[in-house]
């Protein structure tokens, strides 16, 4: 019977392979690797020393992370290969269900830049979310990539080194030991349990985190145990949820743990003080591997004595096993491609989009790309794959999919020194049919409040026809040369019909028709400022826009380019504006990242907006200020040094340069300079207004969005100002 490789994490892995271990007349040696999440990285260092000591290994048994390391070792991965592999992984990504930003569609990228969390709801979401916070598909797909050739359900005793792993059946609390199959398990409460027959299986660390008894039952006469568990904590150290939960788990299996300790011949206890199951940072991984080596070296005399007990000469070295031929660029010959849970229309599109062809060689990277596309562009809730061997050679590629979530609740929240607090709430519902449709409702609360409804349908993947309506109440202070000039309150109505097409995953093009109504209240002017003669304004406009995006991160990117361009033609009756020719607006923005070193980057940018026509209405005048496009007004362009909104002339061009230094892993120091040209007409751009501004800022890249504080100066305002932002920008 075959079982898909499902959720893996700092969890336990049981894998599949074949070959037969060769028995000998000497005593059999079993290596036992305990669980411990990230602390299990120390097993790699310990295995290096055991190998260098010339100890033959006949059995490997592991729990949790110990089963991941032990499973890979048993199929031929060397400690050196595993050392290199774990160091280059992005563990924060692997231990999540995130889709790589490079594979996300444009809508998902925009959502990831606004919402703190997303919560699925509906029939599908209820059944899929029960039992854990994360499904673990990214680690599952990595494990599939690492074990090509061993995806069939087989006997683990026929691996190059016989292997077993431990899990717990939470139906009855019994320990379940796996010696065959294709299975991955989960950390209780974090990764979703695996259901097998009548069992519900989770991480075996709760019942047997140091499974010496399993190795003995397999035939091991001598046990080398590597233990990366924390010692039991005294009362004064049990002061957090994590420490209390860890203590409870350790206490549950304490009696069996003590018994297994007595059955250990060479005990390698790793010093993991200061580290937890979640310590997956590069520096932590490096330290834990080194501590594993040091702990094993401290038992060198015991290893020498063990070798003598085996009757082996001090110069004896076991014959090396064939190393596993891993390469992320490896290609495999695929005979058949099958799917569980994929719509036929989506299947045809995916095969064409990813260039997946039967009876051809396909790279593992291409397969990984296909799984990401299934979860992004086609919006399946999870996608994993396996590669069972095909009759006559080669492999069959089999994708396992979960249905799309029907509904999602998205929430965003932010605080800043201009608007204090703002809350963004969105509900999106997907309707599956011959033509997929989406209904989205969005509300914003704060000083400026808004409501928006979007309805769209996809006649083909990545092609969308959309209808939208938005109401927004605005209360905006306008400034002139750094001093408040007037306040404007108004109600804004938007109706839109659009067609958008994603030509490639990084490029989106859209065209459409908009209706806009600006319903102004009376303006409040500061003394000495001239008034605008503004009544209700409305527009029918035609627009075309393009968005190109390759940033690796929405905030604090380290590579890539972001570019936007748009053209709008404004009328009040579809053909003219105010009984004369329509006016138009051209807007462009381009920013890139030049990585100078691993920590230092330069971010040049150029952007502008140009109005063409006469008698430009107040609602469409150019505006600048703030640190993000469209902050208060759709046409607003950012300018460091001006924190508020300032109206400018019809032609506005801005150049910007940022110098960014990363400190630690999530802290950033940014120096910014920008220069602006503004004129009544484009041809006068070099002759009229010039402005410059600069700023220095600190940023923290947090799970709740960027936390930023900056000091800024601009010659137009001729004053130093401070700006603070906490959270995603919307």
Question: Which residue stretches match the model-derived regions?
Answer:
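Bacterial N-terminal signal peptides that target proteins for export
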Residues: 1-7
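N-terminal signal peptide c-region/cleavage motif recognized by signal peptidases
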Residues: 16-18
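Patatin-like phospholipase
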Residues: 21-63, 71-372, 376-389, 393-395, ...
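Gram-negative/organellar outer-membrane beta-barrel architecture
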Residues: 365, 382-551, 555, 624-638, ...
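C-terminal outer-membrane beta-barrel translocator/porin domains of Gram-negative envelope proteins
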Residues: 408-413, 543-547, 551-663
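Secondary-structure transition into beta-strands, especially the periplasmic turns and strand N-termini
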Residues: 507, 598-600, 667
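C-terminal hydrophobic structural anchor segments
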Residues: 658-691
């Amino acid at each position: 019977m075959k079982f898909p490789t499902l959720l893996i994490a700092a969890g336990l892995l049981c894998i599949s392979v074949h070959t037969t271990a060769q028995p000998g007349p000497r005593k059999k040696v079993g290596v036992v690797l305990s669980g411990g999440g990230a602390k299990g990285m120390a097993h790699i260092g310990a295995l290096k020393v055991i190998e260098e000591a010339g100890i033959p290994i006949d059995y490997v048994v592991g729990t949790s992370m110990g089963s991941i390391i032990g499973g890979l070792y048993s199929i031929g991965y060397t400690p050196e290969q595993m050392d290199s592999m774990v160091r280059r992984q992005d563990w924060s990504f692997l231990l999540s269900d995130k889709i790589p930003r490079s594979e996300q569609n444009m809508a998902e990228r925009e959502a990831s830049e606004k919402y703190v969390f997303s919560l699925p709801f509906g029939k599908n979401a209820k059944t899929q979310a029960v039992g854990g916070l994360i499904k673990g598909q990214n680690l599952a797909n990595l494990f599939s990539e690492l074990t090509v050739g061993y995806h069939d359900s087989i006997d683990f005793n026929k691996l190059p080194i016989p292997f077993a792993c431990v899990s717990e059946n939470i139906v009855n609390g019994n320990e379940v030991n796996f010696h065959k199959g294709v299975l991955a398990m989960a950390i209780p409460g974090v990764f979703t349990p695996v259901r097998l027959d009548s069992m519900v299986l989770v991480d075996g660390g709760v019942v047997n985190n140091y499974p010496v008894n399993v190795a003995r039952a397999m035939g091991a006469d001598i046990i080398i145990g590597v233990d990366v568990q924390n010692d039991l904590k005294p009362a004064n150290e049990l002061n957090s949820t994590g420490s209390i939960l860890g203590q409870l788990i350790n206490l549950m299996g304490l009696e069996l743990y003590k018994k297994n300790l007595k059955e250990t011949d060479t005990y390698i206890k790793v010093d993991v003080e200061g580290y937890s199951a979640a310590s997956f940072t590069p520096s932590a991984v490096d330290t834990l591997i080194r501590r594993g080596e040091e702990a094993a070296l401290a038992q060198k005399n015991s290893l020498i004595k063990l070798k003598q007990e085996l009757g082996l000469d001090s110069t004896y070295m076991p014959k090396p096993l064939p190393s596993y031929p891993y390469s992320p660029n490896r290609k495999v010959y695929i005979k058949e491609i099958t799917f569980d849970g994929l719509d036929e229309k989506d299947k045809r599109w995916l095969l064409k989009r990813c260039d997946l062809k039967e009876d051809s060689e396909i790279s593992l990277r291409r397969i990984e790309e296909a799984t990401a596309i299934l979860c992004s562009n086609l919006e399946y809730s999870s996608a994993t794959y396996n590669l069972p061997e095909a009759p006559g050679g080669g492999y069959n590629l089999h994708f396992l999919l979960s249905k799309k979530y029907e509904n999602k609740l998205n929430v965003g929240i932010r605080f800043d020194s201009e608007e204090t607090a703002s809350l963004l709430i969105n509900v999106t519902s997907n309707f599956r049919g011959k033509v997929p449709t989406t209904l989205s409702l969005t509300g914003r609360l704060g000083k400026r409040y808004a409501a928006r409804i979007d309805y769209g349908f996809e006649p083909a993947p990545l092609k969308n026809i959309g209808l939208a309506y938005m109401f927004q109440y605005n209360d905006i202070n306008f400034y002139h040369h750094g001093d408040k000039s007037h306040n404007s309150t108004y109600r804004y109505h938007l109706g839109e019909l659009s067609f958008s097409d994603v030509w490639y995953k990084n490029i989106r093009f859209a065209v459409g028709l908009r209706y806009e109504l600006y319903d102004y209240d009376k303006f409040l002017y500061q003394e000495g400022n001239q008034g605008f003669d503004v009544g209700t304004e409305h527009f029918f406009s035609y627009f075309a826009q393009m968005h190109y995006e390759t940033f690796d991160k929405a905030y604090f990117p380290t590579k890539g380019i972001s570019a936007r361009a748009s053209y709008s033609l404004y009328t009040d009756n579809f053909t003219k504006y105010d009984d004369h020719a329509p006016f138009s607006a051209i807007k462009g923005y381009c920013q890139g990242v030049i990585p100078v070193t691993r920590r230092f980057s330069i971010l040049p940018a150029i952007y502008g907006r140009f109005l063409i026509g006469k008698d430009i209405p107040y609602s469409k005048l150019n505006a600048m200020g703030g640190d993000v496009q469209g902050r208060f007004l759709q046409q607003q362009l950012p300018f460091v040094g001006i924190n508020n909104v300032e109206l400018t002339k019809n032609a506005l061009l801005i150049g910007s340069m940022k110098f960014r230094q990363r400190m630690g892993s999530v802290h950033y120091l940014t120096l910014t300079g920008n220069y602006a040209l503004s004129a009544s007409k484009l041809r006068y751009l070099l002759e009229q207004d010039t402005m410059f501004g600069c700023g220095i800022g600190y940023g923290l890249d947090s799970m709740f969005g960027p936390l930023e504080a900056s000091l800024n100066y601009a010659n137009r305002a001729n004053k130093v100002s401070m700006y603070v932002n906490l959270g995603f920008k919307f």
